[in-house]
Regions:
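Alpha-helical transmembrane segments of multipass membrane proteins
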Residues: 72-73, 100, 200, 204
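Helix-loop-helix junctions within the multi-pass membrane cores of secondary transporters/permeases
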Residues: 115-207
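Helix-loop-helix hairpins and the membrane-proximal interhelical loops
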Residues: 2-7, 20, 31-92, 103-118
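Perimembrane loop-to-helix junctions flanking transmembrane segments
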Residues: 93-99
Length: 207
């Protein structure tokens, strides 16, 4: 029986090695393509949720915009400029405490009194945040994103986000998908920007 020559064995090994390398490269290429497809799908879903959240605020705007305008005009009557009103509303996104702060502004209390009164009124956000936190943890929302979500959270943002959580639960979604950070931010950013902008307009008109 004729034994294979050393050259034939070497060629055979080389062919096998090339085939294995080609298969590995093909598998890597398929994995990369699949990863890109999943990433693109997640990106599209995030934007879809964001715009869904923004659209859900439209009925609420009927009540929020007039209140923001009234707050701005009251601020102007108490000596706040449009820029000052916008800054206050942007950094303290809570209508009740802002009306209280504007009312206290003219009575010339100390700055500490205004801060304490605002903080006490905003304490309800601690309860709202505590109710939302378990769903955010299940969705594995990072700490920076959680802080951002809490910053733009007001009563209406919380209510719409919880409504979305319950809707997804009824639809049979898993616990990790009940809270949508994108939906929450769509609601929060829309309400936040609308609020401080219309308050600034009210201050400019009423000044």
């Amino acid at each position: 029986m004729t034994k294979p020559t050393e050259g034939a064995l070497s060629a055979k090994d080389g062919t096998s090695s090339e085939r294995v390398q080609t298969d590995a490269e093909s598998a890597d290429s398929e994995a990369l393509s699949s990863s890109k497809a999943v990433s693109q799908s997640d990106h599209e879903d995030a934007w879809s949720d964001f715009w869904a959240g923004a659209r859900s605020t439209l009925p609420i705007m009927i009540g929020i915009l007039p209140l923001g305008f009234i707050l701005g005009t009251q601020g102007a009557q108490h000596g706040l400029s449009a820029i000052g009103m916008a800054i206050m509303c942007a950094f303290n996104f809570a209508g009740g405490s802002e009306f209280a702060a504007v009312a206290l502004w003219s009575s010339a209390p100390s700055f500490i009194v205004i801060v304490c009164a605002t903080w006490l009124i905003n304490c309800r956000h601690i309860v709202l945040g505590a109710a939302l936190t378990p769903f955010m943890q299940s969705a594995k929302v990072s700490t920076p994103r959680s802080l951002l979500a809490f910053f733009v959270m007001c009563d209406e943002t919380w209510a719409l986000s919880m409504q979305e959580v319950h809707r997804r639960r009824k639809a049979g979604r898993p616990a990790a998908e009940l809270f949508s950070f994108s939906y929450h931010m769509g609601v929060g950013i829309t309400l936040w920007t609308s609020w401080f902008m219309v308050a600034a307009i009210g201050a400019a008109v009423g000044g």
